[in-house]
Amino acid sequence: FRLSVDDYHRYIYVDNGRESVHRRIPGVLHTVNPVANDVCPIYKENTREYSLLKSEHFGTLLMMEVGALMVGKIENRPVMSHVRRGQEKGNFAFGGSTIIYMTQKDKVFPDMDILINSADGIETKVQIGSRIGKGKN
């Protein structure tokens, strides 16, 4: 999920679970505008932080925050073992940024509009609390 300057720059846990492993990957600060990714591999070069969440409904999730040109500062809350859906995980200091979620195969199924737009290179605007897919029951 890419946040633009006018978005709320706090992010939350998407499910109840147990958080483990927290790592920071130093890097540079390119813009996270999709056009920039055509020029340089921003998801490989930008400053990043990631953690793993063993979630109740979606298996193990990798949650990664990517710093951006106007942000740079990723402010994650101290790691707690048990977390709750909707609990604040952290925030970006200012500007636009990206949040990446990686899931186990066949555990999460994105909604069709997101799949179609992504295949066409179009971002889908989402808001906190809006559905973006479903977990395998």
Where are these regions (language model features)?
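Contiguous, well-folded functional domains in the mature portion of proteins
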Residues: 1-137
